Each structure stands twice: as C-alpha cells, then as structure tokens.
Amino acid sequence: MGLRSHHLSLGLLLLFLLPAECLGAEGRLALKLFRDLFANYTSALRPVADTDQTLNVTLEVTLSQIIDMDERNQVLTLYLWIRQEWTDAYLRWDPNAYGGLDAIRIPSSLVWRPDIVLYNKADAQPPGSASTNVVLRHDGAVRWDAPAITRSSCRVDVAAFPFDAQHCGLTFGSWTHGGHQLDVRPRGAAASLADFVENVEWRVLGMPARRRVLTYGCCSEPYPDVTFTLLLRRRAAAYVCNLLLPCVLISLLAPLAFHLPADSGEKVSLGVTVLLALTVFQLLLAESMPPAESVPLIGKYYMATMTMVTFSTALTILIMNLHYCGPSVRPVPAWARALLLGHLARGLCVRERGEPCGQSRPPELSPSPQSPEGGAGPPAGPCHEPRCLCRQEALLHHVATIANTFRSHRAAQRCHEDWKRLARVMDRFFLAIFFSMALVMSLLVLVQAL
C-alpha cells in the first residue's frame, strides 16, 4: 500500500513539472528568436529588400463610438480601432528552427511602422502612435492594432436642420512617403460597424472607403490616401418635440386673433404675445446652430411664421379701426358694399342678427319726403282761429325737426353698423387666409420628417 502511494505521488510531481519545463523551453526559444531577429535590425529604414520596391500597407478601420459632433466649430470626435498590416522583409524565420514558433508579440516601437496620419486632423496635438504591441508572423507579416481618438474637421451643412444628413470624411495617408515607396489600400469596401455603440443624436448609415491618388504641387510623385466617409443622419425627435412642435402650435394659434370679438380688447394682445413667444424660441434655436451661410429649414419656418404673425397683427389693428370708426365717417363705398358686404359676406356666412346665412340684407327703403307743413298723422281738425293756426304750425315744425333728427341718427347708426359688419367680414376672410397659410407651412415642414 505504501509503495503504490509513493509511485502515485511521483507521477503527480512529474505531471506538474513537465509543462513548466516545456513552457520554459518555449520562452527560451522566443528569446532566442527575438535576439536573432533584432541583432542587426533597425526601425529607421523602410523594410524592403529592394529600395525601388513599393511597400504595401493595408488599412482597416473599425468605428467604436461617436464621442462628439461640434456643429459650431465643425469638429467631429470619434473613437476608432485602426489596424495596419504590411510585410517586413527583415523579420522572417523558419518555424521549425524555433520549435514550431510561428508568431510573436513585441512592442510596436521596436519595428518599423508606416507614418500614416489623419490628414484632416482638427486639433493642435502632433500626430502620434499608440504604444501597443504588434503581431509578427514567421513570413514577415506585421499586424498592428491600435485604438485612436480622432478629432477631424467636418463641414456641417445645416440647411435641412433638424432633418439633415452629414458626410464627414477621414483621410489617412503617409506623411513623407510617396506612392512609389509606400502604397496604402483599404481592407474591404467600408469600415466595420460591428462594435459600434449607438449614439443618441446621430444615426450611422455607413462608412464607405475610397482610395485616391493625388499629386501635389510640391512633388512630382503621386501620394495615395484612403478616405473613410462617415454617413450620418440626425435623430430629429428631440428637436421636433422641443422646437418645431411648439412653433407649429403657436403658428396655428396666431390666426385665431381674427376670431376674437373686437370688444374683448385682446385681439392685438394675442398677436404681440405670440410674436414674443416666437422670438424666445428663435433665440434658443440660434444658440444651438453654427454660424453658416445657409439658413436652416426650421429657421426659415420661424422667420415665415414671425412674418405672418406680424402682418396679421397689423391687419388686426386696421380692422379694429374700421370697427370703432366714429359717427362722422363716410358711408361704405358702393363697390365695397357690393363686393364685401354682398358676395363675400354670403360666402363667409357673415350676417346680421336674425338674417339667415346666404341671404343678403334687403335694401332699405328710404322714407318718403315729408314737408315741414305736411307731417305724418291724421289730418288736423278744423281750426279757423288765428291763435289755433299758429299753434298748429309750431307743433308741425317741432314734429318735423324731431323726425329729421331721428332719421339722421338712424342713418348714422346704420352707417356705423355697416362698417362694423365690414370689419367682421374682413376678420372672417383673413382668419381663413392666415390659418390656411399656417397649416400649409406646418405640413411642409413636418413632411420633411417622414
């Protein structure tokens, strides 16, 4: 029993010691490989066997996060994963000579790295490289994965704000090597969005890649670069709820000033209040928009609405002057009586009390002329005395004066009522016009969101 226990303990000890010894052998082989590779290696020179040979670099970009889009300064901040692959002619070995070791990971500062930078960089920091490891394979293939936070310039077009789409390009290329020395190409037709973290303000539609070969005035050789164009569309729900929808409701409320009775005294106050509310929203909009040549869509809508409210308030003041015109005003002109108080009043159903809609007021019969001596009423009885005749003539004169005064007062009152009715017709007419304008403008803007 004791002998069997002794053999079991010895077997377990060998089982634990054997992997450690093998691991140590693998570490020694990796150290030997590292010393052999970098004994006469320099990272200062382009790693090609022939100096006339072009070194090909493959560039792959993975979009991880949109950190910030500064519309006012037109700067886009992104978090990217950048992978670069190339072949180093001086870093090759036979895996069989090193125990089957076919890849090692070493600091990127030890090997030559392509000087690929972001051309449209927007900050003052000098271009630098992340100090991450590179994967080196036995055939000389080098793969360098590095995270990067980029700040690039992006021309923001706010003409369709808040339903706008932006195209922001990130151009990568070699800073010193021409196309005959270093050629950069994208891996795939677009950047990867597999690990992208969704942004609350922007929706990413894609990030296609495009290779260009340009020639600059300073040099005769071509310079290739790779441009990744980030396609963005703004999420407009917050702007619709906070800026657009209140303006739509206010614009629909403004024409209702024409429907208020003139005696309420609030017709002009409503228009001025609406104008002040639109001014406040206009200031809020101006704070979030960058200074640009093109006016955003919502800005045009605000200006059109404010113009409409201004005109409606001015027309309200003119109509109130017609409503409160004094008794000494002239009668309504014949053309206005026929056109506005006739056809337009019937079309808008503006009628006097007791008058059915669609029926115009019957023409007023002018009273028959009465002479001061022949007043209305039953004929006077026989009176032949001089005193009786004088009293009868005085009485008839007073009755005629009262009748003429009453007729003049009634004519002035009728003239005033005509002007008030004309004001109601114009109120109803402009209510329909301005409400239709506000509704059409609001629908045109809201259709952009669909």
From Swiss-Prot:
High-level lineage: Eukaryota, Metazoa, Chordata, Craniata, Vertebrata
Full protein name: Neuronal acetylcholine receptor subunit alpha-10
Extracellular side: 25-237
Cellular compartments per GO CC: axon; cholinergic synapse; membrane; neuron projection; perikaryon; plasma membrane; postsynaptic specialization membrane; synapse
Any Pfam family hit: Neur_chan_memb
Purpose of the protein: Component of neuronal acetylcholine receptors (nAChRs) that function as pentameric, ligand-gated cation channels with high calcium permeability. nAChRs are excitatory neurotrasnmitter receptors formed by a collection of nAChR subunits. Each nAchR subunit confers differential attributes to channel properties, including activation, deactivation and desensitization kinetics, pH sensitivity, cation permeability, and binding to allosteric modulators. Forms heteropentamers with CHRNA9.
Entry membrane topology: Multi-pass membrane protein
Activity control mechanisms: Activated by a myriad of ligands such as acetylcholine. AChR activity is inhibited by the antagonists alpha-conotoxins RgIA and GeXXA, small disulfide-constrained peptides from cone snails.
Gene Ontology terms describing biological process: chemical synaptic transmission; detection of mechanical stimulus involved in sensory perception of sound; inner ear morphogenesis; membrane depolarization; monoatomic ion transmembrane transport; negative regulation of ERK1 and ERK2 cascade; positive regulation of cytosolic calcium ion concentration; regulation of cell population proliferation
Subcellular localization: Synaptic cell membrane; Cell membrane
Gene: CHRNA10
Homology family: Belongs to the ligand-gated ion channel (TC 1.A.9) family. Acetylcholine receptor (TC 1.A.9.1) subfamily. Alpha-10/CHRNA10 sub-subfamily.
Ranges per topology, Cytoplasmic: 323-428
GO function terms (MF aspect): acetylcholine-gated monoatomic cation-selective channel activity; calcium channel activity; excitatory extracellular ligand-gated monoatomic ion channel activity; serotonin-gated monoatomic cation channel activity; signaling receptor binding; transmitter-gated monoatomic ion channel activity involved in regulation of postsynaptic membrane potential
Keyword Cell membrane: yes
Entry-listed glycosylation sites: 40, 56
Tissue specificity field: Expressed in inner-ear tissue, tonsil, immortalized B-cells, cultured T-cells and peripheral blood lymphocytes.
Family matches, as InterPro entries: Neur_chan_lig-bd (IPR006202), Neur_chan_lig-bd_sf (IPR036734), Neur_channel (IPR006201), Neuro-gated_channel_TM_sf (IPR036719), Neuro_actylchol_rec (IPR038050), Neurotrans-gated_channel_TM (IPR006029), Neurotransmitter_ion_chnl_CS (IPR018000), Nicotinic_acetylcholine_rcpt (IPR002394)
Keywords carried by this UniProt record: Calcium, Calcium channel, Calcium transport, Cell membrane, Disulfide bond, Glycoprotein, Ion channel, Ion transport, Ligand-gated ion channel, Membrane, Receptor, Signal, Synapse, Transmembrane, Transmembrane helix, Transport
Region (Disordered): 355-380
